[in-house]
Amino acid sequence: MENSLPKYITLTEDNIDKEHICCAFSDKKCLEGYESKKEWLKKEFANGYVFRRLDARAKVFIEYVPAEYAWLPVTAPNYLMINCFWVSGQYKGQGHGYNLLQFVIEDAKKQQKNGLVTVVGTKKNHFMSDTKWLLQHGFKEIEKLPNGFSLLVMRSCLNFIQK
């Protein structure tokens, strides 16, 4: 019997040159930024940065790092910071968001982290993680800024809402 579970891969220094990073892979105007991000990721892997994606030519991925090394101005010691989390188009509704978030939760447990944090928009933005979905899956809003951003936290990975 064939295994029908989707395959996900984690990018590393060893495979990043031959793998895509989801962001604008079809837009030639973004090539310079795309290559710059790959170079940045190579350096950040040493800080525990993780880029996990669907093993397909799709925008289905999650990026996270120990919050102490996050590029966002958030103080959250002993948490994992989700920097980017995206499931687009035809891949929505197939469990990929759940699966990717589960990978982060398992990493947080292995690393004995206090939980997860992320910055989201107070309104839906195409460039931000889906606030509503994260709230439905165990995150709580702990700070709302007047400039349209909120800080979400999952204090204990035991709070994850199972499907």
Description of each model-found segment:
Residues 1-55:
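Short amphipathic alpha-helix that is part of the acyltransferase structural core
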Residues 53, 57-69, 81, 86:
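Conserved beta-strand in the GNAT
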Residues 70-82, 92:
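A conserved beta-turn-beta hairpin within the catalytic core of GNAT-like acetyltransferases
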Residues 87, 93-108:
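Conserved acetyl-CoA-binding loop-helix of GNAT-fold acetyltransferases
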Residues 108-123:
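Conserved GNAT acetyl-CoA-binding A-motif
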Residues 119-120, 135-153:
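Conserved catalytic-core motifs of GNAT/GCN5-like acyltransferases
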Residues 130, 134:
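Conserved active-site tyrosine of GNAT-family acetyltransferases
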Residues 151-163:
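Surface-exposed beta-loop interaction hotspot
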